[in-house]
Amino acid sequence: MLKRVLTACVLIPLLVLILFFSHTLAYPIAWAILAGIAIFEIFRVNGRGRDWLLSIPAYLFAVGLPFGFYPFSESASGGYGAKITFAAALVYFLWVIAVTVFRRGTFAFSEAATVFTATLYIAVGFAALSAIRYGVALGAYLCLLVFIGPWVTDTFAYFTGRFFGRHKLIPEVSPKKTVEGSVGGTVFCIVGYIVFGLVMQFGYGFTVNYAMLAVAGLLVAVISQIGDLIASLIKREHGIKDYGNIFPGHGGVMDRFDSVLTTSILLWLLAQIGGGFAFLW
């Protein structure tokens, strides 16, 4: 526990620093680095770490995508990011299919689907952090919610489950998670988003739609826990405890950012509804 706390004391200020400089190239560079490490972790777990025909294109796809939304000129606004994402995903998909066809008998289609899906999940998840920052009104504030939601949910799900947990959630996937913990994490995520709204309203003078914030908190709590369970399922199927050890006490990038990736995609999608997710203006 001490190791986890000490690591968190380093990670949180580092994250704040990344968000503070989100108007610079340091922001997409940070996500590109983490995306590359996450790809390394996933390919190592799948036993394809040295399969260069698959891993190198995956690295290029995941590392390059966060830059697709960065406004490299004053006239650019990240508007081409979605098109770049779709085109890159299509090219990578066709490449994986081609490798599958030419490796008949040694590379099953089911394994190809797993490789493609995992890579797409990582690449789009980290790219969504850039898409939100550069392509959404007040994106810098929305980026805060991407991290607040999953980490509040995870923290309070742990403590609620520890003190009140009686019923297992999905023991086959994650034996320690409980229904009570899941509910507690969800409630505190909603509360956390409401508190965020109060700070924005009374501290910075924004107009806040608290109903929208509450709905967002509910959806984020659910989707972040799904992301966590997906990552846990992959680990259980491969018989590992953590994806890596880059973050002492927390594991690897995929251990720490599994729920952040699903949340970033969700909040980016919500921001596209009706021309903007109007919770703050």
What residue ranges belong to the model's regions?
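Membrane-embedded alpha-helical bundles of polytopic integral membrane proteins
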Residues: 1-218
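Membrane-embedded alpha-helices of multi-pass transport/permease systems
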Residues: 153-156, 160, 226-234
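Re-entrant/interfacial helical elements at transmembrane boundaries that shape
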Residues: 162-163, 233-238, 261, 266
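Membrane-interface alpha-helices at helix entry/exit sites of multi-pass transporters
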Residues: 170-183, 243-257
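Hydrophobic transmembrane alpha-helical segments of multi-pass transport and channel proteins
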Residues: 218-226, 253-261
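Interfacial helix-loop-helix junctions of multi-pass membrane proteins
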Residues: 230-246
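Final/C-terminal transmembrane alpha-helix of multipass membrane proteins
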Residues: 256-272
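Juxtamembrane boundary at the C-terminal end of a transmembrane helix
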Residues: 269-281
